[in-house]
């Protein structure tokens, strides 16, 4: 089979198009937090075969949800400058092909989790997939400016899925991990929404900066980062983690609050994007600290 320089088979669809549908950066963060959940669930090292299959299944499910999101948002994506080059608006692939790809990924994900992990993890992963791809994308995203607050539950599930994959149960500590991502999600997305407010307004998506204004959103980003700072202390307060984690939580959380204060004082799209970028650093940093603290006792 011949291919052109873009990796596209003659008369076919480029493999890069399928990768773009999967939103690999998002999937990477999801699998990362799920893996952290697996390692935190046990005193030593989790069964590596279970960790492998769980990571693969959760990753495939996340990619399936991402592809469905491409399909369901295709009309809005065609109108927004930042998304016009996505596979569907650019005409690289047909809607039916995207749906088929998403279904295959979803079926494979469920088969892996049922066969090699456990039914509870498969069930919770399926709920997360539906929560993001259907409940959030189809309804919440266009129904309320609190879309990302309510819909954030699906995005906060991965560490719970990882924990459940190893233990077969949902522990209160796993719910603390859920809480961290759940509270992190609004300031993360709202900072981005400030920078891209005009795009969202153009397609009538009621993100908070569109419906309530920039100043209102800036205030709520600050309030949520303060709440996140406090939530970030909970693993230490409850005895889940120790001093290494506490130091990281204070540093990473304090810097996030600092960014939020700067953003509150100045409505600057560049500063909003810097805050958005740091929120990703925070998430990786705080979960990495949880892992390090789990294995190193001072």
Swiss-Prot record:
List where this protein forms a coiled coil: none
Membrane-topology annotation of the record = Multi-pass membrane protein
GO MF terms, alphabetically ordered = protoheme IX farnesyltransferase activity
Keyword annotations for this protein, in alphabetical order, are: Cell inner membrane, Cell membrane, Heme biosynthesis, Membrane, Transferase, Transmembrane, Transmembrane helix
Keyword Secreted among record annotations: no
- Where would you find this protein in the cell? Cell inner membrane
Question: What catalytic reaction does the record list?
Answer: heme b + (2E,6E)-farnesyl diphosphate + H2O = Fe(II)-heme o + diphosphate
Known EC number: 2.5.1.141
Swiss-Prot/TrEMBL GO biological process terms? heme O biosynthetic process
Pathway where it operates? Porphyrin-containing compound metabolism; heme O biosynthesis; heme O from protoheme: step 1/1
A Pfam family hit:
UbiA
Q: What is its main location?
A: membrane
Q: Which InterPro entries does the record cross-reference, listed alphabetically? A: Protohaem_IX_farnesylTrfase, UbiA_prenyltransferase, UbiA_sf
Q: Which GO terms describe its cellular component?
A: plasma membrane
Keyword Membrane assigned: yes
Q: Where are the transmembrane segments?
A: 26-46, 52-72, 98-118, 120-140, 148-168, 174-194, 214-234, 241-261, 278-298
What further note is attached to this protein's record? Carbon 2 of the heme B porphyrin ring is defined according to the Fischer nomenclature.
Q: What does this protein do?
A: Converts heme B (protoheme IX) to heme O by substitution of the vinyl group on carbon 2 of heme B porphyrin ring with a hydroxyethyl farnesyl side group.
- Which family does the UniProt entry place this protein in? Belongs to the UbiA prenyltransferase family. Protoheme IX farnesyltransferase subfamily.
- Read off the NCBIfam families from this record: cyoE_ctaB, PRK04375.1-2
Q: What is this protein called?
A: Protoheme IX farnesyltransferase
Q: Which gene encodes it?
A: cyoE
């Amino acid at each position: 089979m011949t291919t052109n320089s873009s990796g596209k088979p003659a008369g076919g669809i480029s493999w890069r198009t399928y990768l773009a549908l999967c939103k690999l950066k998002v999937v990477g963060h999801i699998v990362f937090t799920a893996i952290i959940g697996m390692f935190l669930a046990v005193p030593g090292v989790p069964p590596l075969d279970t960790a492998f299959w769980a990571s693969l299944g959760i990753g495939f499910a996340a990619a399936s949800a991402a592809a469905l999101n491409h399909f369901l948002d295709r009309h809005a994506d065609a109108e927004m400058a930042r998304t016009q080059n996505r596979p569907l608006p650019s005409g690289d692939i047909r809607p039916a092909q995207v749906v088929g790809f998403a279904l295959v990924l979803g079926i494979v994900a469920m088969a892996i989790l049922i066969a090699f992990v456990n039914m509870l993890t498969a069930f919770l992963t399926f709920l997360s997939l539906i929560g993001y791809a259907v409940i959030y994308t189809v309804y919440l995203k266009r129904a309320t400016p609190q879309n990302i607050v309510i819909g954030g539950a699906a995005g906060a599930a991965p560490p719970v899925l990882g924990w459940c994959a190893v233990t077969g149960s949902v522990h209160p500590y796993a719910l603390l991990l859920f809480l961290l991502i759940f509270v992190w999600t609004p300031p993360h997305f709202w900072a981005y929404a400030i920078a891209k407010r005009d795009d969202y307004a153009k397609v009538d998506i009621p993100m908070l900066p569109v419906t309530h204004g920039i100043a209102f959103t800036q205030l709520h980003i600050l309030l949520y980062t303060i709440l996140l700072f406090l939530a970030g202390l909970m693993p230490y307060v409850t005895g889940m983690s120790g001093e290494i984690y506490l130091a990281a939580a204070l540093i990473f959380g304090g810097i996030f609050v600092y960014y939020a204060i700067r953003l509150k004082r100045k409505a600057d799209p560049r500063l909003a994007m810097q805050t958005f970028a740091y929120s990703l650093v925070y998430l990786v940093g705080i979960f990495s600290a949880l892992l390090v603290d789990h294995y190193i006792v001072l």
